[in-house]
Every structure is written in structure tokens, then in C-alpha cells.
Amino acid sequence: MDTNNNIEKEILALVKQKVSPIEYENYFSQLKYNPNASKSDIAFFYAPNMLLCNWITAKHGALLKEILSQNKVGMHLAHSVDVRIEVAPKIQINAQANINYKAIKTSVKDSYTFENFVVGSCNNTVYEIAKKVAQSDTPPYNPVLFYGGTGLGKTHILNAIGNHALEKHKKVVLVTSEDFLTDFLKHLDNKTMDSFKKKYRHCDFFLLDDAQFLQGKPKLEEEFFHTFNELHANSKQIVLISDRSPKNIAGLEDRLKSRFEWGITAKVMPPDLETKLSIVKQKCQLNKITLPEEVMEYIAQHISDNIRQMEGAIIKISVNANLMNAPIDLNLAKTVLEDLQKDHAEGSSLENILLAVAQSLNLKSSEIKVSSRQKNVALARKLVVYFARLYTPNPTLSLAQFLDLKDHSSISKMYSSVKKMLEEEKNPFVLSLREEIKNRLNELNDKKTAFNSSE
């Protein structure tokens, strides 16, 4: 057995006893021991990025030194040991080389439970459905599909179902569609499909994350179709997570869309301010970070609805305060988080605005571009106008043409209608829609930026 690998495991096992489960999983589990650079008086570790290097060094550098100084952990160390954490070097991959398929990930993250899931009006329905599914011996709804924007807690609730099922000694498979594809290709290549089918069709709970990525892969969709049918026929619980509703997953086979809607579908809405503040307080507690009340309120008010971004903001404030040896106050928070508050929705295209509105209201883009008396379509058209006026330089006439409006004076009325609803704050649905559409625009624009930077 690899001695260096054992050393790394011993060190991390000792760290795990000293920090919170979420802190360990999110940060320390990513550390890699570097035996080649380490000496008797200094231990080197690799971390995947500079933020993680700075965070662990500032907040837990002393803890690592203490652990290494007091425990031999398979190394010949001096009494006093220094610790260095560096960014891991990038590994060049030969595109022509044979694919080395990674093992399938079916493990459930034990840090995601129902007990530490923050419940609010935005997600109460999803929470209750998930608990009922996890607690039932036979599927009350099958399948269950939860959908919504990035970072709203969908993966947390999926893992919570898995953890509860494991406590009841059920056989659980939790996998992303990407890993499902990887494992499928590996078994297909090795001609071991019987083993693949046994793995995924002989479980009590089949939990699939990022179900939207099944689309556009005919062989994978075919295999998943048969896996779904067998699980469903044998009354095995199926839970799916997606970033959009089934009918809005473009390119997904109709027969799969139909099956996704056999049971119950529920949307995870963006959190309201009260829920966001509760999330911020919980993340501070789990990460053992103390922030003043006004700083926590500032994060809840000014950082997006993405829970991971809120947690990132908390950590960023703590890291910077440690590095600067400064007290955490509102001024520090405003300075540190300035870049996180920049609105990525600026400069959106009309096409992206249309797509973001369509996904948020479970409509097709083509439906919104045609005038209709249906309330949801009429609201969608008003929202397209509102965001187009906010984020694009398009003149009124071209916007009217985009929405096939003969009277371009209607644009001002549509914009004013939405603006009034938002200012009066009498319609919580429209308020939550605004945040969801902004989040989707940020995602779409970030993808475009990443694509352009890679060209």
C-alpha cells in the first residue's frame, strides 16, 4: 500500500476530529500531501486554488502545525513543524490518450441532512415532499423531480433523502448524470453491461442529479429509459434534480419527458430575505465563523440567492480579515464583497433574456414571442420588456419587433407595469421571479464569457 497515501489519510483523519463536517468536506478534503517537497521540519500540501490556500493557512494553519507536531503520522518530523500550502500544478492531459474512466460516484454526502436544511416559504413544499419520500417504505410519488436555479439547495435535499434512506438500511445510488454517462461508457467499452444494469437497477433509491444533461445523448437516454422503467415497475423510488422543468429540457426525448412527469414535480424557488439571513447564520455556525449581525444582514441583502455564493462571501470576509489582521465590520464586508455584487446581467442579449424568462416561467421561448391572453404568457412578455430596458441598449422599436408588437408604444406600458409591481412589493411571486431571472441571466452570461475566453 502507498505509504504517502496512508500519511495523507492519517493527517486528514486527525483534522476531521477538530473541524465541522461541512468545513472538512468543503476545504480540508481537497488537500493533497506533497511528500517530495516535505522535510523533517516542514510539511507541504497542495490545494486546488489560491483562495483555499489562503483560507486554510489563515484560519487553520496553527491547527495543522499542532497536529503534525504532536502526532508522528508515519513521518520523521521535528518537534516543531511548519506547514506550507500551495496551489496544485495543472496536469496536462493528452487528448489522444486512451480515456481513463473514473469510478462511479454513488456515495451520499453525509453533511447534507434534513436537520441542517434551512426551510422557508420558498422551499417548504419541496422539503415536505422530500421528507415524505425519504420516510416512506413504498414510493408515495414516483418519480419526484425537483427543479430550479443553481445554488438553491437542490443537491442538499437530494443528499438528505439519501442519508435518511441509508439510516433505514436502504440501498441508495446517488449519481450525477455526468457520472452515470461515464460509468455507462466504461461498461459499454468493457462489454460488462450486465454489471452496469445490476448496479443501477437493483437499488431502493435511485437519486439522479443534473438530469438535464441526459439530453442529446441517444444511447444514454435509451439506457436510462430502460433503467427508469425497471425501477418504476419494481416500486423503487426515483428522485431527479434538474435546473429546469421537463418540458423545458430541449433535446430530451419525449418519452423521457413524459416519464419525468408521471409522479410529482416541484420547483425550488429563490429564498426570500428572511430565509437568506437564516442560511447565512447557519453557514457561519457550520464554518465556525463569527460575524456581526449587520454584516450577516448585508450579505443576505446584497449577495445573490445562490447559497454557495453566500457561503463564499462569508469565507471571503473571514479570510481577508485574518490576512489583514483587521476586525470584521460592515466597512470591511463592503470592500471585500464589492466584486461579488457586480451585476453580470448587464449587457445581456435579448435572446438570453427571453430564454431566462422562459425557463423561469416554464414556457417555451416561441410562446413568449407571440401575443397571448394567457396570464403567464402576458406576464412573461412584460418581464422580457422590463429586463431588456434594464440591461440592453436596444431601442424601443427593435424590442417591439422582437416581440411582434405592432404598436411600439406598448413597450413603455409593459415596462411601467412590472416596475410598479416591484416597487409596491405587493406581489411576492413577481419579486421572486425577478431574482430567479437575474440568476439565470448571470448563469447564461457567465457561460458565454467562459466560452469566449476559451477561444
Curated annotation (Swiss-Prot):
PANTHER family: CHROMOSOMAL REPLICATION INITIATOR PROTEIN DNAA (PTHR30050:SF2)
Residue ranges, annotated region (Domain III, AAA+ region): 107-321
Ligand binding (ATP): G151, G153, K154, T155
Molecular-function annotations in GO: ATP binding; ATP hydrolysis activity; DNA replication origin binding; lipid binding
UniProt KW Transferase keyword: no
Pfam families the UniProt entry points to: Bac_DnaA (PF00308), Bac_DnaA_C (PF08299), DnaA_N (PF11638)
Role summary: Plays an essential role in the initiation and regulation of chromosomal replication. ATP-DnaA binds to the origin of replication (oriC) to initiate formation of the DNA replication initiation complex once per cell cycle. Binds the DnaA box (a 9 base pair repeat at the origin) and separates the double-stranded (ds)DNA. Forms a right-handed helical filament on oriC DNA; dsDNA binds to the exterior of the filament while single-stranded (ss)DNA is stabiized in the filament's interior.
Region (Domain II) location: 75-106
Broad class of where this protein is predominantly found: cytoplasm
Entry protein name: Chromosomal replication initiator protein DnaA
Ranges where the record places region Domain IV, binds dsDNA: 322-455
InterPro entries associated with the record: AAA+_ATPase (IPR003593), Chromosome_initiator_DnaA (IPR001957), Chromosome_initiator_DnaA-like (IPR020591), Chromosome_initiator_DnaA_CS (IPR018312), DnaA_C (IPR013159), DnaA_dom (IPR013317), DnaA_N_dom (IPR024633), DnaA_N_sf (IPR038454)
GO biological process, one term: DNA replication initiation
Entry text on domains: Domain I is involved in oligomerization and binding regulators, domain II is flexibile and of varying length in different bacteria, domain III forms the AAA+ region, while domain IV binds dsDNA.
Lineage: Bacteria, Pseudomonadati, Campylobacterota, Epsilonproteobacteria, Campylobacterales
PROSITE patterns tied to this protein: DNAA
Stated family: Belongs to the DnaA family.
Keywords on record: ATP-binding, Cytoplasm, DNA replication, DNA-binding, Lipid-binding, Nucleotide-binding
Residue numbers spanned by region Domain I, interacts with DnaA modulators: 1-75
Coiled-coil regions listed in the entry: none
Assembly description: Oligomerizes as a right-handed, spiral filament on DNA at oriC.
Protein source organism: Helicobacter pylori (strain G27)
